[in-house]
UniProtKB/Swiss-Prot annotation:
Keywords: Cytoplasm, Endoplasmic reticulum, Golgi apparatus, Lipid transport, Membrane, Nucleus, Transport
Protein name: Ceramide-binding protein svf-1
GO-annotated biological processes: ER to Golgi ceramide transport; response to oxidative stress
Coiled-coil annotated spans: none
Family according to the record: Belongs to the SVF1 family.
Function (record text): Ceramide-binding protein that may transfer ceramides from the endoplasmic reticulum membrane to the cis-Golgi network membrane, and is thereby required for the biosynthesis of complex sphingolipids.
GO cellular component: a single term: cytoplasm
Membrane topology term: Peripheral membrane protein
Cellular compartment(s): Golgi apparatus, cis-Golgi network membrane; Endoplasmic reticulum membrane; Cytoplasm; Nucleus
InterPro entries: Ceramide-binding_SVF1 (IPR051385), Svf1-like_C (IPR033394), Svf1-like_N (IPR013931)
Organism in which the protein naturally occurs: Neurospora crassa (strain ATCC 24698 / 74-OR23-1A / CBS 708.71 / DSM 1257 / FGSC 987)
Amino acid sequence: MFKWAQAALANVAGTKEPIYGPEAIRSVAEEAKTTPYTETTKDDLKWQAMESTCVETQCFYFMTDSGQLAFAQVIYSNVAGIRTTCQFNCKVFSLDGSKPHLWCSTPLNNHEFSEDKTSFYATDCAVELSEDGNSYTIKSLNDERSIVNVTIKRTAPGFKIGTSGTTLFGTDLANPWGSMRHVFWPRCVAEGTIATPDGPVDCKGRAMFVHALQGMKPHHAAAKWNFCNFQGPNYSAVLMQYTTPPSYGSTVVNVGGIVKDNEIIFAGAEGAVTHVAIKGDTENDWPEPTAIKFEWKGTTKDGKQADAVLEGELEDKLDRIDVMAEVPGFVKQIVAGAVGTKPYIYQYAPQKKKLTLKLKLGEEEISEEGYLFSEATFISA
């Protein structure tokens, strides 16, 4: 009970959590031992909209046929059950560095959900799941610099790892005090536009969607993150890795998979991420990576051992985000007061040389070049 009270205090006051140890986390990898993944249904896409501390997001990544990169994101956040805030973010990257990235982050008013919780609405904003559960339409008029009207349709099944997609946190895991959940649509097609001051961005091309829920303070759940979104002509690969703070035993959790049109090749919790080379960031002491290796392991539906590797130079980072300087005030409230917390996100999309996804499915070997969008996030040491 005392530890639960400490956790409750840490959630409200931003104090540092005590050391609970690895026994205070049940990784989704435990579920994945017997059920590596489950294909998503419409129910999996419902907003949880928790009434306790949480950050819940739906994020849509666009890799356009014309070679542009962008994302749109809705964030729902609750601080200690006291205040709920929603935000719409849109970013259009300047891949050649000739101009600043377009970054628009707008607080939303009058948010609500559809009756079945699968669609989100606010003033001048709508993120709607179609009746058949296979496509989303994202519309935002909240910032005249980025007027979004895009539809994505999945071309492969979505998945969650294990049966729930969820890692639980707490000393009594039957009554957890925290959670982390991810649901993916790794391979989609997009159409529509983002109207910007430099003209419309035609989003026709590939897309990826992830619905994430951190049912606790973000810096309590993870000390660092790695994210891979790879899109090739025939294959898509996604990997999300997070490492908990020492309070939960610095536990590493990997969730990801490889898909092609109409089929999940394999998915599970046996991935790995290695920062093959780092140069370090002189401004904040974080070990900024310059080369990376993503790995996936699993079993195909017909029982073949499956492995995949994506490795290469990250080239110059696209962006470095000082989270505390850029995130909305409500997220700062969640992180405020946390000792040793200085979150930075490093974003990459190698342009000079495409990376190659190397698949081994049983005896069959497949290599495919494609486009990578990757993030390395450092929150606390």
